[in-house]
């Protein structure tokens, strides 16, 4: 049985967005599930769009997500694998060899036309109300190709192509999709249309998974496969990732972010991987969250949907919160090192882990950590609006609020052994003494001791703050309530 070999071939032209990550994830899952090989290839022939540092960001982002590759370039500048080079700019000689085969067969020709002449052809086709096809304007006696002009493919046969896509099913396109496209540009570098076909064959790629936008170009690719007399790999097109509105492809204007932005916001790679997999794929059950191991075991191309998958950032954040809750404390602590607020810098590890244990269930992203924990490390800024805008507390007069806080302070002061359990018993007693509902009394105590909208369980929060600090903050609140 032929070993499955898949690839991800990004261009170093900018940041890695979620669409690119999913384009890497699906072939990686297919390779890992079948004990195959996953190849990373850098398609860097478009030098006009090259961005310094973008290639290094590709390595960094894939590694962060947990996608490893068996062959290709590495971050240390070396390559692994026997089918290199894995940068297209270093494979010019290979492309020229394949181009010569087409020239010798009469299936490629030098393009002698200037941009102005091509525009005139376009205008002529438009005047005739016809689609512009370059093959209708082929030069009758093209010059010998010397490498300074573009080299064009001469479509050998104008026919309808039909192919089987494991995701989209049977697809076909007629002659209108076929044209004489450029193989080698005037700068000597190949176009994507030519290079990826040569590379996939040379690197023995068995399955190509790419976006649905490539469906329209597939007949051109198939005509080139025929001309080169090579068998195409399995060609699969995954659905578009749609904007939150669901009516167009996701773009920057729809709030699309780079993978690096999500990483800096505290999205876990496990959550991102599970979320990306769900954008167009499911296992046929109600399960929503998958570990890497589960995805490798369950991923199937025939479970990828044909229609576009709507991007829902709220769902990603929800999913991230679920993964955070499932981490053990030590693992979560290690991941939080870059996310603590500056007020936590001087705190010791034991105390920070105690704080993190309380905050864990409320964290949706690691970036939430400072807002949820700052009052454990420094004195919070008094914000009386938290009381004034609280639906329950604004029913009380300021004197009633102060009285409740004073009674609470007096009762809590009676606790000798300051533990969560004893504090909870005291809070229950306070409910009886004051004849108040928890939503009123506990909210008032929580705000007075943390000046935050949310906090962990009140008794646990007070226990970790300590008796002196808790009582001091209650007294300060009493003095500041007008």
Task: Enumerate the predicted regions with their spans.
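Charged substrate- and nucleic-acid-binding regions of tRNA-handling and nucleotidyl-transfer enzymes
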Residues: 421-481
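Residue-level signal for inorganic ion chemistry
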Residues: 27, 58, 102, 106, ...
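Small-residue-rich helix-loop
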Residues: 329-434
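Glycine-rich phosphate/pyrophosphate-binding loops
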Residues: 32-44, 194-207, 228-242, 456-459, ...
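Active-site cores that bind ATP or allylic diphosphates and position pyrophosphate for catalysis
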Residues: 101, 109-237, 243-250, 258, ...
């Amino acid at each position: 049985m032929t070993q499955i070999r898949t690839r991800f071939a990004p261009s170093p032209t900018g940041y890695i967005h979620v669409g690119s990550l999913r384009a890497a994830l699906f072939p990686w899952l297919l390779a890992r599930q079948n004990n195959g090989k996953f190849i990373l290839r850098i398609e860097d022939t478009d030098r006009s769009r090259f961005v310094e540092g973008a290639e290094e960001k590709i390595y960094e982002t894939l590694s962060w997500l947990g996608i490893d590759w068996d062959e290709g370039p590495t971050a240390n500048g070396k390559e692994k694998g026997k089918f290199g080079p894995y940068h297209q700019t270093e494979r010019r000689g290979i492309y020229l060899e394949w181009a010569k085969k087409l020239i010798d067969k009469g299936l490629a020709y030098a393009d002698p036309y200037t941009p102005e002449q091509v525009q005139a052809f376009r205008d002529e086709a438009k005047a005739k109300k016809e689609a512009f096809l370059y093959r209708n304007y082929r030069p009758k006696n093209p010059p010998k190709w010397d490498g300074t002009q573009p080299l064009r493919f001469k479509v050998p046969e104008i026919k309808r192509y039909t192919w089987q896509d494991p995701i989209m099913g049977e697809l076909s396109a007629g002659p209108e999709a076929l044209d004489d496209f450029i193989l080698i540009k005037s700068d000597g570098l190949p176009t994507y249309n030519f290079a990826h076909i040569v590379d996939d064959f040379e690197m023995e790629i068995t399955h190509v998974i790419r976006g649905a936008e490539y469906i329209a170009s597939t007949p051109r690719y198939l005509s080139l496969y025929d001309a080169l007399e090579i068998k195409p790999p399995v060609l699969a097109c995954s659905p578009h990732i749609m904007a939150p509105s669901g009516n167009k492809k996701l773009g920057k204007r729809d709030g699309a972010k780079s993978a690096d932005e999500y990483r800096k916001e505290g999205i876990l790679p496990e959550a991102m991987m599970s979320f990306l997999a769900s954008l167009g794929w499911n296992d046929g059950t109600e399960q929503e969250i998958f570990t890497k191991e589960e995805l490798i075991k369950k991923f199937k191309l025939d479970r990828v949907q044909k229609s576009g998958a709507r991007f829902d950032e709220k769902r990603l954040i929800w999913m991230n919160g679920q993964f955070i809750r499932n981490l053990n404390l030590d693992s979560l602590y290690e991941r939080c090192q870059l996310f603590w607020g500056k007020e936590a810098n001087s705190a010791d590890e034991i105390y920070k882990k105690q704080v993190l244990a309380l905050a864990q269930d409320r964290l949706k992203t690691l970036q939430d950590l400072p807002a949820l924990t700052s009052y454990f490390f420094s004195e919070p800024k008094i914000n009386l609006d938290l009381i004034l805008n609280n639906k329950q507390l604004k029913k009380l007069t300021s004197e009633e609020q102060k009285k409740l806080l004073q009674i609470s302070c007096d009762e809590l002061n009676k606790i000798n052994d300051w533990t969560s359990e004893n504090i909870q018993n005291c809070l229950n007693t306070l409910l009886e003494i004051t004849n108040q509902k928890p939503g009123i009394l506990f909210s008032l105590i929580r705000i007075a001791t943390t000046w935050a909208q949310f906090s962990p369980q009140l008794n646990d929060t007070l226990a970790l703050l300590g008796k002196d600090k808790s009582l001091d903050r209650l007294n300060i609140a009493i003095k500041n309530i007008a």
